[in-house]
Amino acid sequence: MELASRVYDVITDPDNIHESVRSIIPRKFDLEYWRRALRMAALCHDLGHLPFSHAAERDLLPAGWDHERLTLELIRSGEMEPIWTAMKVNSEDVAKLAVGPKHYKDSRFDDWEAILSEIIVGDAFGVDRMDYLLRDSHHIGVAYGRFDQYRLIDTLRILPKVDRTSEEEPGSQEPALGIEEGGIHSAEALLLARYFMFSQVYCHHVRRIYDIHLKDFLKSWLPGGVFSTSIEELLRMTDSEVTQELSKAARDENHPGFDSARCIAKRVHFRLLYQRTREDLEKNRESGKAVFIAACKEFGESEVRHDTYIQKGSGLNFPVIARDGRIFSSLSRSETIEKVPVVAIDYVYISPVCRKRAETWREKNLTRIISSKEGVEE
């Protein structure tokens, strides 16, 4: 909420408004209203997250549901309506800004609403991403996620979108969050911080396997293997409730989630058996799947896990205004931004019971499995 407020105050400062987008900026009274709505949207943006956040979401909600839809339901709930009434804020304005155009399908976004939602959920400069990088790096005790957020925010501007092939003239009058040329190094630092946090922390193989064990536990424990979408039940289900049940399950061999709970509580998690390399990718684009299938045949499906992930929303193309007033694509102004890698992982894990035997098997068979594309359809 604090970062969203800072961005809003900077980009609506009359001295910072580009002439081509001045017409979309509301009058002063409306500016005060939209500042309140934006702050509440930033505060409510993650209301719909399940216990332990993203770890549980993909396979543990009924079809058609995700945390953005749950967020919308919570914002619109009867419990929240008195708050919006007291604040003189329309709940639908809060909902739109909180989840953005990709997840709010009930009406179109005008240019102003699109910019405000971009402040929160934007791929390049969304404050949700700024916040979790800074927060997570602090609490984990690493420096990967740090960048100069104050310098970056001070140089943000609303600018017309620009096509990379159009070097001097904007490709569209549609506005987007961009940056002054003087802030380009801060933007580079943000995007590199995101890359390093994903490659070194979020996608670390041990962290990922605990997500898998947690998901397996929840599937075995929750009624029907999914979370309820009832607002009342959702609010009652917290991290503490899950942790308490997991601790209980780890001590009870008859509990349906015993095996997964024990992996977490006793730190006997599955171990990394295979991690795809660039060389493997050149030989077989589905090398991880091939190893997984072969390992399942050798050791049994219950002893093997497969985990893949490709980073989404690079959001590297944004407008940059030069000191002489010309507007360029970020990709033409920064080789660093152009070349930030996309994080992609492909892991195969083995149970501790089979680890030694599996490592010997891997040494003898890995090259053949990858080269022969064993069990993988073309």
Q: Which role fits each region the language model picked out?
A:
Residues 1-40, 47-271:
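Sequence-structural signature of the catalytic-core scaffold of metal-dependent phosphohydrolases
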Residues 215, 223-378:
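Terminal helices and disordered tails flanking the catalytic cores of nucleotide-processing hydrolases
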